């Protein structure tokens, strides 16, 4: 399922979305870092809590890492590996994505459940055209 348009995210932005896997609704985050689009489950590896603590902030202030807002675990954006904090060496659960026809798609077997929410300029904006679509 399509979760976003490729053009929805500028460098250093994040986009939160819900998806269904094995009958469970889970939360994911799509980030653009160094030109790459990457997707992870929105779940810290230290404790099973959202990285953003509900405020849709994923990047550190300097924009170089992803960070868990609860206990400060810091993750390398391109690999998902924790480089500092209580779960050092653990890896965020990556979500397989593909880019086709100008859209970012979740892998087969994972379905988008709700429209994406993009983090931009200190506020979250609900995306009008990036919600779940039937294939």
Placement of each model-derived feature along the sequence:
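Short Gly/Pro-enriched loop/turn and capping motifs at secondary-structure junctions
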Residues: 73-74, 81
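Short cysteine clusters
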Residues: 44, 68-71
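N-terminal pre-ligand scaffold of iron-sulfur
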Residues: 1-62, 76-77, 91-135
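Short cysteine/histidine-rich metal-coordination sites, predominantly Zn2+-binding motifs
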Residues: 58-68, 82-90
């Amino acid at each position: 399922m399509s979760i976003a348009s490729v053009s929805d995210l500028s460098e250093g932005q994040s986009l939160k979305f819900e998806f269904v896997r094995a009958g469970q609704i889970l939360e994911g985050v799509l980030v653009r870092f160094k030109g790459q689009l990457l997707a992870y489950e929105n779940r810290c590896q230290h404790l099973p809590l959202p990285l953003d603590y509900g405020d849709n902030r994923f990047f550190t202030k300097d924009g170089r890492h992803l960070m868990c807002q609860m206990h400060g675990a810091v993750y390398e954006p391109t690999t998902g590996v924790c480089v500092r904090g209580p779960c050092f060496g653990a890896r965020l659960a990556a979500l397989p994505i593909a880019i086709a026809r100008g859209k970012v798609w979740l892998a087969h077997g994972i379905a988008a459940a709700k429209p994406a929410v993009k983090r931009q300029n200190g506020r979250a904006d609900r995306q009008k055209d990036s919600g779940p679509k039937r294939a």
